[in-house]
């Protein structure tokens, strides 16, 4: 039997490719997709793809949930603060015409605390909840090989697995509702530490050899050196865009990455890891916060930090980070990294969350 879904975030880079991957008569189909109405060529293509899939495009949550003719709601949206707002608006509407026990499949990257609080809140509302974060970027979503980090109810995973295998590469990490979020943040530790390593090397190469950061010689150098023991995928998927093509506004965008770094720092702290694990995440979060402040209104991806790491710019980055990092007080450093963010990004972090946060 085909699973009937409605979706929030269907115009985004990670969920929109599902419109073409899920075929008629398959394991699942989307009945309706919520559209915030942002106009550009990419989203227009997404709208057409969803229409070709057979989904109706709707502009409010009330129409999205309709008369309760769906099995589950798929949400692939923002961070804790963004998605908490969605849940507050959505759940009362789901309750109004609830025909059975629906589920929410939450694909966003949120903190482990969010996943637990959402589960506790929705369980009391008679709604099943699972958080399956995605990793692999827009290309992974487009090619249906992104990793889907699943956990929580085994019966829900078994029901969804054929659908998940159609849009990506799922792996189930057990019955803990927070395991998917935790695994995603483990991956982000690898991403951000790899990013700092390759950016440090690129900045040092520029200074030692007295060369520009970008250019064909730099690209050839790191194509070679990245084949050694220090190789990282952050060369291929991130900084090579800047070094090879002088492109700094495409990739993992800083306003999203900074929140993930804070979530990773918080999780490491909660699980008792040493400052050696936590402080680098705070430092990279502050580096991203510095970019957001220095280049306010200019879209920049994470690898743009390398431009602040060369000698002529390094003092500005140092001055900013040393204001906020306290190596002897990890908790204060995490709080300071949040306080340093622009307000709109700060609101999305929402580290302090419990089940009462979702009450409208």
Q: Where are each of the predicted segments found?
A:
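Hydrophobic beta-strand scaffold residues
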Residues: 57, 128-130, 275
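NAD(P)-dependent dehydrogenase/reductase Rossmann-like domain
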Residues: 268, 285-360
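Anion (oxyanion) recognition and catalysis
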Residues: 23, 51, 123, 164-165, ...
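Rossmann-fold dinucleotide-binding core
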Residues: 8-9, 109-192
């Amino acid at each position: 039997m085909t699973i009937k879904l409605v979706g929030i975030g269907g115009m985004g880079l990670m969920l929109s490719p599902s419109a073409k991957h899920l075929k008629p008569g398959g394991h699942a189909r989307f009945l309706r997709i919520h559209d915030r109405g942002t106009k550009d060529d990419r989203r227009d293509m997404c709208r057409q793809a969803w229409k070709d899939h057979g989904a109706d495009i709707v502009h409010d949550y009330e129409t999205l949930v309709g008369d309760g003719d769906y099995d589950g709601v798929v949400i692939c949206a923002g961070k804790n603060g963004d998605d908490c707002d969605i849940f507050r608006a959505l759940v009362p509407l789901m309750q109004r015409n609830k025909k059975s026990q629906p589920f929410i499949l939450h694909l966003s990257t949120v903190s482990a605390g969010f996943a637990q609080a959402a589960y506790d809140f929705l369980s009391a509302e008679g709604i099943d909840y699972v958080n399956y974060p995605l990793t692999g970027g827009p290309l992974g979503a487009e090619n249906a090989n992104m990793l889907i980090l699943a956990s929580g109810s085994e019966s829900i995973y078994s029901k969804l697995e054929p659908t998940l295998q159609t849009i990506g590469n799922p792996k189930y990490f057990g019955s803990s509702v927070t395991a998917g979020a935790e695994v995603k943040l483990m991956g982000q530790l690898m991403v951000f530490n790899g990013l700092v390593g390759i950016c440090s090397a690129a900045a040092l190469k520029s200074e030692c050899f007295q060369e520009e950061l970008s250019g064909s010689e730099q690209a050839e150098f790191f194509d070679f050196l990245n084949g050694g023991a220090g190789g990282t995928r952050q060369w291929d998927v991130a900084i090579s865009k800047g070094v090879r093509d002088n492109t700094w506004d495409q990739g993992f965008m800083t306003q999203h990455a900074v929140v993930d770094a804070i979530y990773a720092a918080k999780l490491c702290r909660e699980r008792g890891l040493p400052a050696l694990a936590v402080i680098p995440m705070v430092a990279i979060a502050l580096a991203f916060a510095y970019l957001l402040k220095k280049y306010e209104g200019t879209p920049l991806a994470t690898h743009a930090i390398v431009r602040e790491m060369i000698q002529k710019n390094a003092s500005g980055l140092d001055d900013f980070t040393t204001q906020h990092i306290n190596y002897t007080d990890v908790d204060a450093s995490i709080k300071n990294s949040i306080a340093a963010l622009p307000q709109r990004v700060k609101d999305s972090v929402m580290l302090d969350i419990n089940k009462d946060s979702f009450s409208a």
